[in-house]
């Protein structure tokens, strides 16, 4: 199939380079997560960049089914840390587990005026 837009590259190496050299501002959009079915109906938006204090449900991986609040969004590592997901080190200390946002579903949004404005811009209905 032919390329429709001449401005977008189909090259795998260029796509990978763009992904791994993305700035923090660009990584925010790359760290988006889908909304749950209820939220999708409520706000008429499919996915949003994930933020601290959003509540998420893990839908893939060994921690599938776990729920919790997002403690931090680690843009440098393309990961989020959820409050209830921790592993214990051999010395007894507990460390947070990093999860990619595409492997979670947002179940409750942390809304403020900026987030509501973003939903409006995306064509959704912020209530």
Curated annotation (Swiss-Prot):
InterPro entries: Rib_uL2_dom2, Ribosomal_uL24_CS, Ribosomal_uL24_euk/arc, Ribosomal_uL24_KOW, Translation_prot_SH3-like_sf
Stored PROSITE patterns: RIBOSOMAL_L24
GO biological process, one term: cytoplasmic translation
GO molecular function, one term: structural constituent of ribosome
Location(s), subcellular: Cytoplasm
Gene Ontology cellular component list: cytosolic large ribosomal subunit; preribosome; yeast-form cell wall
Pfam families assigned: Ribosomal_L26
Keywords: Cytoplasm, Ribonucleoprotein, Ribosomal protein
Subunit structure as annotated in this protein's UniProt entry: Component of the large ribosomal subunit. Mature ribosomes consist of a small (40S) and a large (60S) subunit. The 40S subunit contains about 32 different proteins and 1 molecule of RNA (18S). The 60S subunit contains 45 different proteins and 3 molecules of RNA (25S, 5.8S and 5S).
Similarity annotation: Belongs to the universal ribosomal protein uL24 family.
NCBIfam families the UniProt entry points to: rplX_A_E (TIGR01080)
Task of the protein: Component of the ribosome, a large ribonucleoprotein complex responsible for the synthesis of proteins in the cell. The small ribosomal subunit (SSU) binds messenger RNAs (mRNAs) and translates the encoded message by selecting cognate aminoacyl-transfer RNA (tRNA) molecules. The large subunit (LSU) contains the ribosomal catalytic site termed the peptidyl transferase center (PTC), which catalyzes the formation of peptide bonds, thereby polymerizing the amino acids delivered by tRNAs into a polypeptide chain.
Protein's name according to its UniProt entry: Large ribosomal subunit protein uL24
């Amino acid at each position: 199939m032919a390329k429709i837009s001449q401005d977008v590259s189909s090259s795998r190496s260029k796509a990978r380079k763009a992904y791994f050299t993305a700035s923090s501002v660009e990584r925010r959009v790359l760290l988006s997560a889908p909304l749950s079915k209820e939220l999708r109906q409520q706000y008429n938006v499919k996915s949003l960049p994930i933020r601290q204090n959003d509540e998420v449900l893990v839908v893939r991986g060994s921690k599938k089914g776990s729920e919790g609040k997002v403690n931090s969004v680690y843009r440098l590592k393309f990961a989020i840390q959820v409050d209830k997901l921790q592993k214990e080190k051999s010395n007894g200390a507990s460390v947070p587990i990093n999860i990619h946002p595409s492997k979670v579903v947002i179940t409750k949004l942390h809304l403020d005026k900026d987030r509501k404005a973003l939903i409006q811009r995306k064509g959704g209905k912020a209530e």
